[in-house]
Curated annotation (Swiss-Prot):
Gene: EML1
Domain ENT: 1-88
CDD domains assigned to the protein according to its UniProt record, in alphabetical order: Tudor_Agenet_AtEML-like
Protein name in UniProt: Protein EMSY-LIKE 1
InterPro entries attached to this UniProt entry: Agenet_dom_plant, EMSY-LIKE_plant, ENT_dom, ENT_dom-like_sf
GO MF term list: chromatin binding
Species this chain originates from: Arabidopsis thaliana (Mouse-ear cress)
Keyword Coiled coil among UniProt keywords: yes
Length: 327
């Protein structure tokens, strides 16, 4: 009976794909969000999706409609912002939006970006030229995530001129900080709001953190190009036991050992490796984090060994008057 139920679920999902394909070879953000939810509710896996989509593409009726459309028949454009339909077979990852390395510093240049007329031009016609794009650094922006229809606040911190993408940082400077590279021209005007913009639209502001949204994105597989991102665990400063040195001084902050939170690191790496279709970029980041953590542990052990040798040479033993910091 369970097999029959799942067959009905696949038939329903296929019917929706055929209907969307019949309408257009392109898909709007709204349709993509709907398909994402259907995949979850109808229990359609990534492999099943690819197989069903392949069947739809080979369907004789769909092919006739496609030929008719390409033959010059009038086509009603239902949505202004669309993307190729065939990106859906692997919705888990997208080159458009992936979390990158932590930015070492954040120095917003608000004064250079407070031009509201430029802001309006950006939303309606995109960015023209590197100078205008870089002027957005430091701006506050809200973007809508299709899966919950909420807007989330981010700060634009960098611009990659080669790829034409801006870095959006959510929960900046917080322990759960997350970020993504975005081509702002790909975001529909109704899905983005700018600080100071008098749009007359009441924002449905989300109260969840960006890290929660990143994890949720990884679970439902899809949405507006945001793939599951590897969330770099927070580093913790672990001071060695305090000791008196030869001149009676205490240790300095340079004596602290900086390590990733091991539990968080292991969980994050497991999440990346356990995904159905791991992203090579995310795998590479996970390997680099593990290697960095390994090197930090080796360095910490070496420093502890040096300190222990100092005790054997006659230095006073450690005093334990400084508690370990709570993560």
């Amino acid at each position: 009976m369970e097999t029959q139920i799942h067959q009905l679920e696949q038939e329903a999902y296929t019917a929706v794909l055929r209907a969307f394909k019949a309408q257009s070879d392109a898909i709007s953000w709204e349709k993509e969000s709907l398909i994402t939810e259907l995949r979850k509710e109808l229990r359609v896996s990534d492999d099943e999706h690819r197989e069903l989509l392949s069947r739809v593409n080979k369907d004789d009726t769909i092919q006739r409609i496609r030929d008719w459309r390409q033959g010059g028949a009038s086509q009603i454009t239902r949505h202004a912002t669309i993307q190729p339909f065939d990106v859906l077979p692997s919705p888990t990852f997208s080159a458009a939006r992936k979390k990158q390395k932590t930015f070492p510093s954040y120095n917003p240049s608000i004064g250079a970006t407070g031009n509201r007329s430029f802001n309006n031009r950006l939303v309606s016609s995109g960015i023209s030229g590197n100078e205008s794009a870089e002027a957005l650094i430091g701006r506050k922006v809200w973007t809508k995530w299709p899966e919950d229809n909420h807007f989330y606040e981010a700060i634009i911190t960098q611009y990659n001129a080669d790829e034409g993408r801006h870095a959006l940082v959510y929960d900046i400077h917080a322990a759960n900080e997350t970020w993504e590279w975005v081509d702002l021209k790909e975001i529909p005007p109704e899905d983005i709001r700018w600080d100071g913009e008098e749009s007359g639209v009441a924002l449905n502001i989300g109260h969840g953190s960006a890290s929660f949204r990143g994890n949720r994105r990884g679970q439902i597989h899809g949405g507006r190009g945001r793939g599951p991102r590897i969330h770099q665990p927070r580093r913790e400063l672990v001071p060695p036991p305090t000791q008196q040195n030869g001149s009676g001084g205490r240790r300095t902050s340079s004596d602290d050992i900086e390590l990733f939170n091991t539990d968080s690191l292991v969980k994050e790496v497991e999440r990346v490796f356990d995904s159905t279709h791991p992203d090579p970029l995310e795998l590479d980041k996970a390997k680099k984090m593990l290697k960095e953590h390994e090197q930090a542990l080796i360095a910490a052990i070496a420093r502890l060994a040096d300190t222990s040798d100092g005790e054997m040479d006659g230095d006073p033993p450690y005093s334990h008057d400084h508690p370990m910091p709570q993560g």
